[in-house]
Amino acid sequence: MSDKTYIAIDLKSFYASVECMERGLDPMTTNLVVADASRTEKTICLAVSPALKSYGIPGRPRLFEVVQKVKEVNFIRQQKAPGRKLTGSSVQDGELKANPALAVDYVVAPPQMAHYMKISARIYEVYLKYIAPEDIHVYSIDEVFIDATSYLSCLLY
């Protein structure tokens, strides 16, 4: 049996990234959580952006946990802010790092599963431009395994 080489692709915080892109925001630097805020704060968040995770928020928290953690972070920011006063807020990581007087804020985006499925299908079409469908193994809406064995072997000759 010959060895096979696989490539694993897992799109970074997929639902949160889609929501950021829809808003013209950078998914790596924007504080965003995907959750149905019309339900109680006990609702489970579908996704948390990488920037918001950097404050110690896990990937699938309940919404009240996000609210609580951001309050804790802002309490600490206020203690360190000039005059111990927060003068505004931002959802942007760069602005928050540059200005200690800003409170951490975040966007709550309602889930849009049908839209995420459409975006996932568009991404799959990109894979198909370069990889045969039989070599793409879909694991989930944002993860695939690609059998790259035959593509790599042609590089050796």
Q: At which residue positions do the language-model features occur?
A:
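Gly/Gly-Pro- and Ser/Thr-rich, intrinsically disordered tail segments characteristic of DNA damage-repair
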Residues: 1-156
